[in-house]
Amino acid sequence: MSTFKKPTRGIYVLDDLKQFVASKTYSEIVQFIRQIVLAVKGKQNAANASDSISEPMQNIYELLKYTFNNIQKFPPEQTNNRFGNKSYRIWHEQTLVKDATVQIAKLFSSNSGNNNQEAVLELLPYYYDSFGNATRIDFGTGHEVNFILFLLCLYKMKYLNDMDLSFIGT
């Protein structure tokens, strides 16, 4: 039986939030962010670093590059949209919902030794929710947290390790 499962929303009311803040999961998220902060303390920007980037970090970089390069394929509509441009929805559906499954699966098909295709089920929603909400066409801190959760999952799976944290933070 797989230990991976599709994430679901669990915070609807204030009591849910209070329960989450007291949970092990919340502590793990905060600890992961602290580890990243400590990993970059006193270090130069990764763009200028002479250290080599690990294969897993290079794979994540390629995933992000693929995601952002696809923006060119979906230029904004020339309309007066008060709440965001609807071409974002098309980009989100094609690049994140459809293509991201294949792209995230590629993370585990490299020579990194971690070949867990079942993890895609859990990782995919965190990744595509990192880039905003296609229904509301919005972006906020919850979406940023989704990217942290995507990275945290990779870290807990041991796809990423402590040496990768400084690159994540810069």
Where on the chain are the PLM-derived regions?
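N-terminal leader regions that mediate targeting or early regulatory function
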Residues: 1-129, 134-148, 168-170
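Well-ordered alpha-helical scaffold segments within catalytic/enzyme domains
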Residues: 150-161
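Alpha-helical bundle/repeat cores within regulatory domains of eukaryotic proteins
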Residues: 160-170
